[in-house]
């Protein structure tokens, strides 16, 4: 299940060209995994790319979940307890199936609020069913560091 973020109307404010948007700070080249790939491949890819999670898609390219270090830690503990090898299990057995997303035209403040409200580390950035990128907590901090002056505008 994919949950797309649309901020409440009462909290929306008029957007100007000078506002700092998610699309300006998201990572555009997103590493994704197919839901049928092995958990071992996921562990290796996350480790080698120094990332903590990634979107999971089905064979049609539709977002169906997110796999994270936390999901993998649960798998490692279960596999040790039951003495089961890790390489034969697919991503779909361990991924988080309820995915919270955000749209590219939301501000970094909308994203920061959403990170705090939902306690997530990353959000796929979506336009309809298409993954445009991914934004993380560290991307929000990067954006905040680049803001000049006290008015929170570029």
Could you tell me what each predicted segment is?
Residues 1-154:
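Tandem CBS (Cystathionine beta-synthase) repeat/Bateman regulatory domains
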């Amino acid at each position: 299940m994919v949950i797309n973020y649309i901020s409440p109307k009462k909290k929306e404010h008029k957007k100007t060209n000078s506002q700092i948007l998610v699309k300006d700070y998201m990572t555009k080249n997103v590493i994704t995994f197919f839901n049928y790939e092995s958990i071992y491949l996921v562990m290796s890819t996350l480790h080698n790319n120094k990332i903590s999670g990634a979107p999971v898609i089905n064979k049609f390219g539709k977002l169906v979940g997110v796999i994270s270090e936390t999901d993998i830690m649960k798998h490692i503990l279960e596999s040790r307890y039951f003495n089961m090898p890790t390489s034969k299990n697919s991503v779909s057995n361990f991924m988080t199936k309820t995915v919270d997303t955000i749209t590219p035209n939301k501000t970094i403040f909308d994203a920061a609020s959403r990170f705090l409200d939902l306690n997530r580390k990353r959000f796929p950035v979506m336009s309809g069913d298409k993954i445009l990128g991914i934004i993380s907590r560290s991307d929000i901090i990067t954006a905040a560091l680049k803001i000049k002056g006290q008015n929170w505008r570029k």
